[in-house]
Amino acid sequence: NYSAGGNGGRGWNCTAPNSAGGLGGIGLSAHIGASRIFMGGGGGGGEGNNAVATDGGRGGGIIIIRANEIVTTGSCGQRTISANGQNSSNAGNDGAGGAGAGGSIVIQVNSWNIAATCEVLVRANGGNGGISNTGNAHGGGGGGGQGAVIYSITQPTTNTTTQTQNGNGGCDNNSSPC
């Protein structure tokens, strides 16, 4: 969890403007570096009393790549290295679970040779919280915090995209927009 996770939804028939649901996990940005990384935290389960709440999403894992060179050739479109957190499932008439946080990716590569026809996407995004999708629903799940991508030797300069984004919180009470 590079950044904090999002808070859960307002809850059943709550008109308060602020969240009254579960709190998101703490961000670990001050503690993450090439020699200290963390798995993404799992999301909390939704509150339920009607047996239709959903579980929280799994957190992203840890990927460590050590290589002299990474090369792509040909027309592959895109290759992906992913430690994304899992989205939470949508809930019925109970609370939706929170999403998993993105994990950590450490890449120690001396040389990059990435073809424009075979780009690389490196991502450690938080998952999206579940939606409470009935009018009497309790509350949406919080979004997962962003993960971390660390290039500890040479960072790629072309044809590589790096993503570390927070996940979105789920909608409350079937609201639109959230």
Residue ranges and their predicted role:
Residues 161-163:
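Acidic, glycine/polar-enriched metal-coordinating patches/loops
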Residues 69-71, 111-114, 154-158:
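Acidic glycine-/aspartate-rich tracts in secreted/extracellular proteins
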Residues 1-106, 121-150, 166-178:
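Glycine-centric low-complexity/flexibility signal
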